[in-house]
């Protein structure tokens, strides 16, 4: 246990939760092992493999950002792209050529010196993924124009390009070793029971203050009824119930991400009927009375701050369709939402068929073709406006919500919008796109989450980030008192 051996963790899995909590208590939170500061985080589920491209889970997205770096990254204060593997970049006057200047002192986690040609090779591999091909649809080619320069040639200007490269989905692993990166932490163990990352000695930016962070996968310690939910706060400690008051909530906030409802117009569902459905959700007590944990969610009145949902009057006389089908995926809070909506609509003469898609997104095989209504959640990690543009471009959802002409028009609008060099103008144009989707009752946000982080005494530098996690590079432990 003291050494954090994987076999010990496997043996623990056989213990009853009470015994396990008693045994693990001294080992959790911040510890010094052999004069090395280590943070151990109990986690309620195994982590999914870190694959290239988009990842469904918050924890996996966060971990990918610790292990891999991109050409650019999002500044944690401004949420704007800044240099990472590339220290600067230049954009030609016509917006069609972007030169990224690569740092000359980069090393992979295995100690090898990094070459620009390896980054080029990895980018080409990423562009072969269908979702990332959509994301980088404006890229004509990528070239190594100098040993320290990567050049992107575009079909049309794309002033989101630095944002696209900063997104965790575009972070760059070694082209031949997909779990080797250049981020602040290197992956040293990835099993269903234990994940361990250690600080990267050759990291090119500010070095982490902790040597190691471990995820101990201990579902027995968490409420078995929760399933896959966003309600698990990131709690860096375990204690008996009477000891939990020692944990102090160090950071909290409302998520920018949200659970949403989309509505497909058809012969079965017209715009007025869709608007009435949206009104029923937002103007009744439906969202306030969901059977979910207290202080977990807050009903949405805007898609993003300032992007408010529309108000419509005199829709009570609009007759609803006799039958509709709702398809939804995780998190589990949407079970409660779906059932509540089914009951409310039944009292209004509308029979709602529920189809649950047991996944965290719409990738792979999905039942969207059967749906009039769809529910899911839209995680937002950073740069919220850009993240929503990426959602419209890449998510399987939209070709099913919109008919073919409307979907083509949406993509053409995004293509035109990205050519605006001024970020405020891009944001305003994108807000108008979403305002139109909300006005048509094609999209409405349902609720946001309360994110909370609790830490035991002695774990410092824990600051909530937009994903509901904390920056691993900033956390630190004081030396043990002698």
Regions found by a protein language model. Give the residues of each.
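Detector for C-terminal structural segments
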Residues: 17-26, 31-34, 276-308, 336-340, ...
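N-terminal lobe/hinge region of extracytoplasmic solute-binding protein
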Residues: 42-91
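A structural "hinge/loop" feature
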Residues: 46-60, 112, 161-167, 449, ...
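Aromatic- and charge-enriched surface segment that lines or borders ligand/interaction sites
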Residues: 56, 88-131
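Surface-exposed binding/hinge segments that line
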Residues: 131-176, 184-189
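A bilobed periplasmic-binding-protein/Venus flytrap-type ligand-binding module shared by bacterial periplasmic
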Residues: 198-201, 253-276, 289
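Ligand-site clamp/hinge motif
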Residues: 202-245
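Ligand/substrate-recognition segments at binding pockets and active sites
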Residues: 314-377
